[in-house]
Amino acid sequence: FHLSSMSSLGGPAAFSARWAQEMYKKDNGKDPAEPVLHLPPIQPPPVMPGPFFMPSDRSTERCETILEGETISCFVVGGEKRLCLPQILNSVLRDFSLQQINSVCDELHIYCSRCTADQLEILKVMGILPFSAPSCGLITKTDAERLCNALLYGGTYPPHCKKEFSSTIELELTEKSFKVYHECFGKCKGLLVPELYSNPSAACIQCLDCRLMYPPHKFVVHSHKSLENRTCHWGFDSANWRSYILLSQDYTGKEEKARLGQLLDEMKEKFDYNNKYKRKAPRNRESPRVQLRRNKMFKTMLWDPAGGSAVLQRQPDGNEVPSDPPASKKTKIDDSASQSPASTEKEKQSSRLRSLSSSSNKSIGCVHPRQRLSAFRPWSPAVSANEKELSTHLPALIRDSSFYSYKSFENAVAPNVALAPPAQQKVVSNPPCATVV
């Protein structure tokens, strides 16, 4: 093909036309001995779907967020907060010139978008911008954190370090200090000193690179090696530093890792006023002595006053659940004529009274204080649910002891005169008589 096209004055197009003409002559039957080459028809290219167009999020719902202790108005666009840039420049970054701010934005590759007409109108109505403002820039919360961290904050020296010898800063190694790291904006490793975490803004994490101290919410923005300036960051909030700071992977021992992880969780739980961090409690955190005491109390509460104890079935998870009590053995009673039905009835009544008193005393004395409803504490659905579940497992004799007939104990129990209702005197009045006029 290449040789023929080069020798032809028409180039490849002329050769293709001549080759097609020769194939046409062969199809007409001039040379039937040679096989005819049938090419499959060329399929047209598939129709490519058009680009997926999605309308941009033009949310006009204004909300507020906290940036470096200042309240900034923002709009939630695309799932992330976009802050009012003029408000940041006039409050948080008021000590910096526009030239300094622009240079940092260029270095960190921070892009600021423009708000829509509706968003601009809302900011004007709320008094955040003057009515003469032609436009307003919006910056994401993530980029605002990066910008403020680059301009505002630097680390502090360790408490036992002399500033004159700042080139030789040593690590603040204590009995409880351990290594941590984060993976935000290029990663950074540090040494956490729990003893120094005395307030939410206390510098308690020492960077292993520059040896300066940072608060937890500033350490997660701090980085040295790769700043990830060409990475699109989304959804960062320094207030969520409890989720960003992790235990160092240098600790491989199981016991050491568990101990340091518990120290890190205790540190994260401090000053958590909004209860954002909730660690998973272990399944059995009670000591064996406390568990044994609780099991004994539970067995005592389920004691059958009639003479037998409740049966506890062990579940697959190791817990013991009471089951129905075994059927009491019937004593053989000789049907003799000397035993009168009146004495039998009295014995039944006395046994019922003993079972009633013992069950009530034991149920009052053995019920856990948190399971008992108090008149000075509001009702809790969890407590009532636990009591309801516990009552379903109690033996039938204890459950049914509160339901009895007072009439059956009239002969065995002396009446309480002090609590008896006052006797009402019957007033007999003569019925009115009809008078006939």
Swiss-Prot record:
The protein's matches in InterPro entries, at most eight in alphabetical order, are given as: c-SKI_SMAD4-bd_dom (IPR014890), DHD_Ski (IPR047315), DNA-bd_dom_put_sf (IPR009061), SAND-like_dom_sf (IPR010919), SKI/SNO/DAC (IPR003380), Ski_DNA-bd_sf (IPR037000), Tscrpt_reg_SKI_SnoN (IPR023216)
Gene3D superfamilies in alphabetical order: SAND domain-like (3.10.390.10), Ski (3.10.260.20)
Which keywords fit this entry according to its UniProt record? Oncogene
Q: Which cysteines are joined by disulfide bonds?
A: none
Any one Gene Ontology cellular component term annotated for this protein: transcription regulator complex
* Highest taxon above the source species: Viruses
Q: Which GO MF terms are attached to this record?
A: DNA-binding transcription factor activity, RNA polymerase II-specific; RNA polymerase II cis-regulatory region sequence-specific DNA binding; SMAD binding
Record's signal peptide: none
Q: Where is this region: Disordered?
A: 308-365
One Pfam short name? Ski_Sno_DHD
Question: Which SMART domains does the record match to this protein?
Answer: c-SKI_SMAD_bind (SM01046)
* Protein's GO biological process: negative regulation of BMP signaling pathway; negative regulation of transcription by RNA polymerase II; negative regulation of transforming growth factor beta receptor signaling pathway
Family membership, please give it: Belongs to the SKI family.
Protein name according to UniProt: Transforming protein Ski
Species: Avian erythroblastosis virus (strain Sloan-Kettering)
- What is the gene called? V-SKI
